[in-house]
């Protein structure tokens, strides 16, 4: 890269920032060293990402840098189409609560810890869970669902998605981290947050799959009418 490409980033975004692949899945290319405090750390991390990981090209679709939001993290499942809000299902969000031993800058889904590889990052003490899921404060649920739906509409989403949201602990403002297109689907909370979302919503995995299929049938009918 040319270092001038990173000029002014901290002036615009503040510190710390997180740099990550524009397109990825399963936290690939994301680790605690992606959170950087200055331009030297940023450039070093960018060079590492362009080098790739185990043959994967982490920068194939570019990299993005954004402010690192310190605060609680939520995730929301949506089934339906952006242009049919009355037929869409916005599930109750869950809060992803990270192990209390972690510093704030390490409370996110890093690849190393998520998949228990532990090449560069340590496991939790006493074999503790990296994270657990709980229902958020009831007073926040509507706002989390609204910002998630607005992000889905902005992306013209269809089918299903999972939207990750954070609240700035200082300002209490909600920010969308990403809209996960075709997120992993499983009822097992050890593999995806969908299992936790279904649990707090008192829904079965079969019911979710039926909702997704019915939405696909509806879009097909509307397209052929």
Each model region followed by its residue ranges:
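A short small-residue
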Residues: 27-29, 120-133, 193
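Glycine-rich phosphate-binding loop of ATP-grasp-fold ATP-dependent ligases
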Residues: 16-47, 73
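A short linear hydrophobic-aromatic micro-motif
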Residues: 17-18, 62-64, 160-162
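Phosphate-binding site of ATP-dependent enzymes
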Residues: 39-128, 139, 146, 173-175
């Amino acid at each position: 890269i040319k270092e001038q490409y990173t000029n002014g980033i901290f002036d615009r975004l503040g510190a710390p920032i997180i740099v990550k692949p524009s397109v990825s899945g399963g936290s690939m290319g994301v680790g605690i060293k992606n959170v950087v405090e200055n331009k030297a750390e940023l450039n070093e991390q960018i060079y590492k990402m362009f080098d790739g990981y185990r043959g994967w090209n982490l920068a194939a679709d570019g990299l993005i840098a954004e402010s690192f939001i310190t605060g609680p993290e939520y995730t929301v499942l949506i089934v339906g189409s952006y242009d049919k809000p009355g037929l869409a299902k916005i599930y109750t969000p869950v809060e992803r609560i990270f192990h209390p031993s972690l510093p704030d800058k390490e409370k996110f889904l890093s690849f190393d810890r998520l998949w228990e590889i532990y090449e560069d990052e340590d496991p939790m003490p006493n074999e503790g869970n990296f994270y657990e899921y709980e229902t958020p404060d009831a007073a926040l649920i509507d706002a989390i669902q609204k910002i998630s739906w607005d992000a889905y509409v902005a992306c013209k989403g269809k089918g299903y998605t999972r939207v990750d949201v954070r609240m700035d602990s200082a300002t209490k403002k909600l920010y969308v981290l990403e809209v996960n297109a075709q997120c992993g689907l499983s009822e097992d909370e050890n593999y995806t947050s969908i299992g936790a979302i279904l649990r707090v919503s008192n829904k079965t995995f079969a019911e979710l799959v039926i909702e997704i299929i019915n939405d696909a049938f509806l879009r097909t009918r509307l397209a052929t009418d």
